[in-house]
Regions:
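Bacterial N-terminal signal peptides that target proteins for export
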Residues: 1-8
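Bacterial N-terminal signal peptides
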Residues: 8-17
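Periplasmic c-type cytochrome electron-transfer domains
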Residues: 19-171
Length: 171
């Protein structure tokens, strides 16, 4: 259970890379990856995300049996900004949860894949790990943080992997 999120994330990336009509690409050198993502991730010297001090007033930790590691935190940051998680490579989590707006969206309804609109305003995504709410989304349809992370990818309007209208389904 400890490595479940990492395994799901890797599996999801592998699955998404197989969902293409394009020719197979060759491996990209590490330097090219750094240039594409505009960051300098050094796997041997990761930031210390796992051991952050937490204020005493915070009593809840939504990570449960899936503790945060530096590797998982870096993977999460990369996936959060990765537009290839949408069916048409135009939308990432950060498209709606914009850092400049407190990880929320300045519009009433966010824009999803193929120019479509979502039905709701994107919720703010700050410290969901320590949220005192027991469920996620406006309608509380996600019982766990892991479900909250994967649901938008499978939504027809948000990121498109819904299984509707001939689209692939990740579920």
């Amino acid at each position: 259970m400890k490595n479940t999120l990492a395994i799901y994330a890797i599996g999801l990336v592998l699955l998404l890379s197989a969902c293409s009509d394009q020719e197979t690409t060759t491996a990209i050198p590490y330097q090219a990856v750094k240039e594409v993502f505009g960051t300098k991730i050094d796997p041997s010297n990761l930031p210390n995300y796992a051991s952050q001090s937490i204020p005493n007033y915070i009593r809840k930790d939504n990570t449960g049996t899936n503790p945060i590691t530096n590797e998982k935190a870096i993977l999460g940051r990369v996936l959060f900004y990765d537009k290839s998680l949408s069916i048409d490579n135009t939308v990432s989590c950060a498209s709606c949860h914009q850092q400049a707006f407190g990880f929320s969206d300045p519009t009433l309804a966010s824009q999803g894949v193929q120019g479509g609109q979502t039905t709701r305003h994107s919720m703010r995504l700050i410290n969901t790990r320590f949220s005192i709410e027991s469920k996620f989304f406006w309608d509380e349809r996600a019982a766990t943080l892991e479900t909250q992370v994967t649901t938008p990818i499978q939504d027809h309007a948000e990121m498109g992997f819904s299984g509707q209208n001939g689209r692939p389904n990740l579920a």
